């Protein structure tokens, strides 16, 4: 990593590259599921390492089972959950008191044991809130809970054919809220006007793949491409970059599954760091991982020219990678941990969390210089990662955790399937 560049400057550069179209997030804000720069990390704050009942600042029961990640904006916590058979968005204050609850249409419950009808996380641009649910409801909501507009993408474009539960979260640009659908059938990327909900463009995105290879659950990223704001989409075994004006594909990279493996959906969201997209693919959960380093830049089909490196010995199936201080960190589905140089793909170090029968579904977080990784059984591991790996805590929450942890100063928010927790300083 380049240690001579100050952390403050590095964070600004990453922010400018990735967060085009969003308002600048102050420390403690977490406007979407992987944070203000989509890295899954923060350089500010110092959330707790170990906690006991006295350090659980509050615990609030949610109205139904959910797997989305909360977001934070201006001392408010926003989280989706089903309520009385309907999709809902909740707002809480820092004490955990519910300020309002807004309901939409009927819930479409999850099929997977670790899925729900509200896997996608909310997003905010500082002017309003945007939500999407498995039922197809896409909505814009004011900070007082009033619905500005809503539409149903299942009613408009038909149901998805995903084997499991929709997980892609809304993506915000200066003008648009963007949604994607990657499945067997008509797959697409669509942009909707943030103010009115009117669809501005819809671009087909269809590729022939082996069985389930065209199923996608990852969330797109807004990046800077050749000097312009663009959208990077991972799914159907292709990485594509789209012009935000009309949705057309301006860059594409394939070659992710030349062996034709079946049952390889796209789940983990890539990270972008130092001009490289790091893409976790394959079936790490079945001992067949893939980790790709793809150089960005250029135009057209770059499959033959921009594939920088490939690892076949390490990866992650569900948890998304984290970018932090010039390195990419992986937490595999069974707890293997690695710190990787994105330029070469080589590991600085590898280690593992304690083995157990449960797997990792939540995407990890780096905050306070430490790695926070919830396991599906509710154990939240915390490890020091400076100059190697050192496990420092395992905190048992007592309920399953699928949503990713969210930092805010000296606090950490954890979304269990039934409760929302705040741990840290009071």
Which residues fall in each region the model found?
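Sequence-pattern detector for short linear motifs
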Residues: 6, 14, 35-37
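Bacterial N-terminal signal peptides
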Residues: 8-20
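N-terminal secretory signal peptides that target proteins for export/translocation
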Residues: 1-8
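Noncatalytic, solvent-exposed loop/strand surfaces
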Residues: 24-426
